[in-house]
Amino acid sequence: MGIPAYDGDKALEKRLRAAGKSARLHRARDVRALLRGVAAAPPDVVADAWMAMVVDRPSAALKAQLRALKARCDARKPVPGLAVGERLGALRARLARAGVDGFIVPRADAHQGEYVPASEQRLAWLTGFTGSAGMAVVLKDGAALFVDGRYTLQARHEVDPALFSIQHVTRRPPSRWLAVNAPRKAVIGYDPWLLTPRDVARFDAACVEAGAHLKPLARNPVDTIWSGRPAPPLAPVVPLALRYAGESATAKRARLGAVLAADDVDAAVLTAPDSIAWLTNLRGGDVENSPLPLGFALLARDGKVQLFMDPRKVTTAAKAQLGAAVTLRDVAALGPVLDVLGAKGRRVLADPATAPEWVFRRLLRAGAGIKEGADPCQLPKACKNRVELAGIRAAHLRDGAALTGFLAWLARTAPAGKLTEMAAADELESRRAGGANFRGLSFPTISGAGPHGAIVHYRVTESTDRRLKRGEIYLLDSGAQYLDGTTDVTRTVFIGGGRAPTAAMKDHFTRVLKGHIALARARFPEGTSGSQLDVLARRALWEAGLEYDHGTGHGVGHFLNVHEGPHRISQVPNTVALRPGMVVSNEPGYYKTGAYGIRIENLIAVRADGKGAGGRKMLAFETLTLAPIERALIDVKLLDDEERRWLNAYHARVAKLFGPRLDKEAKAWLKKATARV
């Protein structure tokens, strides 16, 4: 169906006037300005959802004209800019003109989130690196890109080593590199919106050690050379119904306000969009893969909230849910509001690990008292309520049905040797999209065939798209967003077609499986942190001298971020205790560079599990994810009786739930895939 012709601005404005009070914008130029932000946001999962920012109840004719205008705006050619190889030199020239000798470029925006909008992708624009975590430090005579173990291979593929030396962020952190490489008396610039106070403290110490000086810059120099930089994203902000949230925004605000009052704090600055979305029961779409409305908030001890975000994107339905206790302001009002708090001598809570240093500088300059502490929404958001947990279970049933059907299809299709990584990922997404409440993927699907599976966070592109081949391992890490929950699952599959896996493949896979089962079966006392459990997932690998260079588990939100804190399961020390209602991933792995990757991931929820000696409360895990685990890669001799019992019970549950939903051929495959070991 083609796009109708655009009848012109005057005709559009006439239709907007005819919409009466339903219209939120009345001039075509305002609609065009809005569309620049719409173009910078991820595409709507629900067709024409963006129109709610223009008009509440558009007629069919008005919808057609809005679509036509959007198509016309989308067809504009992008502004040409510098080639990737020219950007580093241009940045150095800009720094020299400003009297600055170096600059720190994090992969971050003012919200410190994992997914940042296109307008904030400075690290990718400058270096070519597209991973979800990293940082660059640029000096006059050298530059380095810092990534963690998930991205070392990817960085080598994407970044010119003649421009940036690639460093492992934990083995040689950016601050240490700067301490060694910064010339004496050098001025090192940074954007205070993009670094936290803790970041700044580390870099300041490094500069002192090097005899250099760290300086905040009023304007980011990357922005001054970035021609054609996208506009800030605009996606509609909508209410999340109480039947999904399980607790009203009013109750949440009152509960957290009481916590602030008990701590003798007047207000808390919230800079994490997922915290704001959870507190207000709102969802948006400003970034890929997470339903986040970008903005800031100020929560007062009386439970009232000032919400700072572009008012154009807050729909009429969202405003109605906010009510009189929430004041909506433009982002530009944040600074003056913080100034007022300072002038009144208020005590303000801010998180030095997640809030931009700009917030702290503004509050201190205004005279406010600052209490450094964790975002007050983090912990209550992580502990899902009964309604959220019920929704998450329901989402995993739909997700598991889609994935199980896909795995049956894959077993039939892949051995022919024609299926590619990209086509497989697209097939799975289409199956998920057919389910109820689907709102997009929760992260870009990792579809890694053969050696690509060894790249922990591999992202397939048209230039890297590889066929799935017989005799190879295929790693598929995927997830989705649903109105009632967020999923994240990894399955590792052997592409048979008459071939058999090697003994090494089976050994590696089974050791990963043993670690997965050990964590899933864990029973532990209240007060235990994830770092205390991490060894359970690694032990079988360690016994063979093997290891994986990533965490074992990350927190997962409820129709929010697929990666959330404050809890995690990792070798990195973490004092946050696991609590009932927390959802976390269980994903040990093994990666043989140039050959294959193995990872088995289910989401698990912390639950109460009776009492131990002395009446101490005990906890355990409920496995949420449901999909077959590859039997062809299991060396049964390596499993003990308890491990076999766990696997057989898990597969029996999968078969019972999904067998009736499959066609005859897929049902026969599932019977074999879930047979007892």
Listing of model-derived features with the role each one plays in the protein:
Residues 79-677:
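Active-site neighborhoods and metal-handling regions in enzymes and metal-associated proteins
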